[in-house]
From Swiss-Prot:
Gene3D superfamilies: 3.30.1330.200. Belongs to the CheD family. Pfam families: CheD. It comes from Desulforamulus reducens (strain ATCC BAA-1160 / DSM 100696 / MI-1). This is Probable chemoreceptor glutamine deamidase CheD. Keywords: Chemotaxis, Hydrolase. Transmembrane segments: none annotated. GO terms for biological process: chemotaxis.
Amino acid sequence: MELAKGNAEIQVGIADYKVAASPNRLITLGLGSCVGVVLYDPVKKVGGLLHIMLPDSTQFNNVTKPAKFADTGIPLMIDEIKRLGGIPSRLTAKLAGGAQMFSGLDEKFVLNIGQRNSKMVKEILSRMGIRILAEELGGNRGRTMIFDIASGQVTIRTIGSPLKVI
């Protein structure tokens, strides 16, 4: 994880996260069944964007990328936001992704990863006392998530749909 400085648009890869302060923007592409989690301290104007792939790390023996999972990635990102001066009790969340990318398949073959990711993210945020201000979850289309730290706005670009600000 690297700390972003200045006025930049910083890419967040799959199974990764970035934290930054205003006036930076964080962007992640390819949110299908993955979930993008934005955490923001509106007073300090610092925040982060996490791109999780799976809900739970406990099913794996050797977790080398904790940002891949909701249960390990969210606490990790909160720790980094605290290093920038963010206060956990002030954090708010915005979520996107969690799509069912393989619609039309026989139900018994579908793992519902998107739905499970969304559910786990919400459970973890609730346990940590972090309020979800907005979400753009589900459906069957990929999304791009752009987080403007200066304003706290998150713009969602969904294939075949107009831009949506949450």
